[in-house]
């Protein structure tokens, strides 16, 4: 339903500068929050889940920014008012950069909760993100196609690092009570108690 609202209907979100907001909501906030609720049956972990959901949404929106960055002239020619058409490449290039930085800042309470070792994850992500952003600033047209994949891979790297940080460093009771319904010894044998 939301995919249809994104591109079709009487007021397609992607044609009116709302595509990025829709991606943050429907590729980040909604799926992460409801997946957590479905797996745990509770909203108790919201202080970590809400920032995580927004971070995932921001990183997913960066894929859309690269796509719209590439297609700016074509979109403008057919009156498709993406954020890149509205604000320009320079501004949206900055938004791309800051989306990744803000996403990592949103994760600081969780990284701090997990352990100092888990801080490797956002540092590695930021290095990848800044490298991709530098390429974005220098590229136009078809040169941006590989950056779509790199931006998506950056999101995947973030998600995998977050997963491993949680698996390796969550206290046993958190894994059992909130994430794995007391099946942590079967589902999550690496959930090592932290004293």
Language model region names:
Residues 21-25, 49-54, 93-97, 119-121:
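Hydrophobic alpha-helical transmembrane segments
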Residues 57-101:
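Solvent-exposed interhelical
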Residues 177-195:
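Transit-peptide-like, low-complexity N-terminal presequences
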Residues 1-43:
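Intramembrane alpha-helical segments
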Residues 31-53, 105-118, 163-182:
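Helix-coil boundary and interhelical linker segments in multi-pass alpha-helical membrane proteins
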Residues 1-8, 47, 97-143:
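Transmembrane helix-loop-helix
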Residues 21-36, 56, 84-89, 149-162:
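Small-residue-rich segments of transmembrane alpha-helices in multi-pass membrane proteins
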Residues 1-4, 44-66:
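Membrane-embedded alpha-helical segments that form the functional core of polytopic membrane enzymes
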């Amino acid at each position: 339903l939301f995919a249809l609202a994104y591109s079709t209907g009487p007021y397609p979100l992607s044609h009116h500068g709302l595509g990025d907001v829709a991606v943050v909501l429907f590729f980040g906030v909604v799926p992460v929050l409801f997946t957590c609720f479905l797996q745990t049956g509770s909203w108790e972990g919201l202080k970590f889940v809400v920032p995580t959901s927004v971070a995932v949404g921001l990183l997913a929106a960066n894929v859309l920014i690269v796509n719209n960055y590439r297609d700016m002239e074509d979109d403008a020619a057919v009156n498709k008012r993406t954020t890149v058409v509205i604000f320009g490449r320079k501004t949206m290039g900055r938004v791309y950069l800051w989306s990744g930085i803000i996403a990592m800042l949103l994760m600081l309470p969780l990284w701090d909760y997990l352990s100092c070792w888990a801080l490797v994850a956002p540092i590695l992500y930021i290095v990848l993100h800044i490298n991709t952003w530098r390429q974005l600033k220098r590229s136009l047209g078809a040169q941006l196609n590989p950056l779509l994949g790199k931006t998506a891979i950056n999101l995947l790297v973030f998600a995998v690092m977050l997963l491993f940080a949680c698996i390796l460093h969550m206290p046993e009771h958190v894994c059992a009570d909130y994430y794995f319904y007391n099946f942590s010894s079967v589902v999550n044998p690496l959930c090592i108690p932290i004293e």
